[in-house]
Design a protein with these regions (language model features):
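Secreted, periplasmic, or luminal enzymes acting at the cell surface/secretory milieu
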Residues: 5-139, 145, 149, 170, ...
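Short, hydrophobic/aromatic beta-strand segments
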Residues: 137-144, 156, 188-191
Length: 202
């Protein structure tokens, strides 16, 4: 079995990913990173991290690939609001690993999703029941995305609106609530120089 350990701060091309038994991403771990990675590899620690970027299938799929070369010291920001996963959603490009992806030594199941009106500080909240269906204790990150189904506005296909992490023993279930505040539904209005919530279905 071959396990690939990545240490870096940005996505890389992984054409050989299918030949790996597993991939562990250490990001930029610092002086304690070696021991932390050993703990994950030996099973002393159950990983629960999620990717902070989208991993493309090919380098040519990266939006800056066409105007960034090894001979240039800078690259122009041409992505508009479509940064990171928003770009891949917009162009419907297949990717190797999605933003927010991550595995564990246990498994989780979701159910009973419900959305309720919010209180003083949020527009609404999303509640979902998460169950640890494996045989090891572990942690899961619940991610809630918003998507506008109608209305006008220059916006991404979907956006991460909130998240929450829960630790569960084997067989344990927990209702996880993620508050969705006004900013999760807002667009910036250049005329008003302020954030505005567009009417419509989300």
């Amino acid at each position: 079995n071959i396990v690939l350990v990545l240490c870096g701060g940005s996505p890389v091309e992984l054409p050989f990913a299918g030949a790996m038994s597993a991939i562990v991403h250490g990001y930029l771990p610092g002086q304690g990173g070696g021991q932390a990675i050993v703990d994950v590899l030996t099973g002393a620690h159950n990983p629960s991290g999620k990717l902070a970027e989208t991993y493309p299938l090919h380098y040519r799929d990266v939006p800056s690939a066409g105007q960034f070369t090894r001979h240039e010291a800078t690259a122009e920001h041409r992505d508009s609001i479509y940064l990171g996963y928003r770009y891949y959603d917009k162009v419907a490009a297949p990717v190797r690993y999605e933003f927010g992806y991550g595995l564990s030594y246990t498994t989780f199941a979701y159910g009973d999703l419900a959305v309720s009106t919010g209180g003083a500080e949020e527009i609404c909240s999303a509640t979902v029941t998460v169950t640890n269906t494996g045989d090891r204790a572990g942690a899961e990150v619940v991610q809630i995305y918003t998507q506008a189904h109608d209305g006008t506005g220059f916006r991404a296909v979907r956006e991460l609106a909130g998240f929450a992490k829960v630790n569960l023993a084997p067989g344990e279930s927990c209702a996880v609530t993620v508050p969705l505040r006004e900013h999760a539904f807002s667009l910036f209005d250049p005329e008003a120089q302020d954030w505005r919530v567009q009417p419509g279905r989300y």
